[in-house]
Amino acid sequence: MQIKEAKPLNFLYFRTKTRIGELGRFVGVIAQELYRDAVRYDLEITGPVYWSYQGFTGRDSDPFTLDIALPLAELPGSYHGMFQLKREDAFPCVSMIHEGSWVGLQNSYARILEFMTEQGLEGSGKFREVYINIDFMNPTGNVTELQVGIHPESFERFRHVPADGVPAYASW
């Protein structure tokens, strides 16, 4: 587990309002369309698929905003595809690598939230999942970075600059 500031990113993204029970219909489908659109418009993809959740409470009946996104090298001056473009600011967060089936994501999130409570870190209400490796045939091969947003004030308490001038962050 690590407290870090994810760097600002450009995204090609899809946004929807949804609930937990509806997430399955987006798996694989939207990412594939994002890749197609990026290739069609010659957009340089610079990383794996991101899923971002805003307003997520963990309760089945509560709606939240879901963004499914691909990071891009730059935002094009002209784009007429089927998705949206945005630049996201730096994202202070508690990060953890989850290896294996996504069925176990809930337990990994519980560990992060427990850690945040122990450390007195205030959540920002935003969650991100970075799908480093997706293996539908062998889910134990999945590698997902979980990022739980924290308020900048919480992040600043943990940040320090060592003698060589390179920022370093606490890691557990």
Regions found by a protein language model. Name each.
Residues M1-W172:
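A solvent-exposed interaction/effector surface
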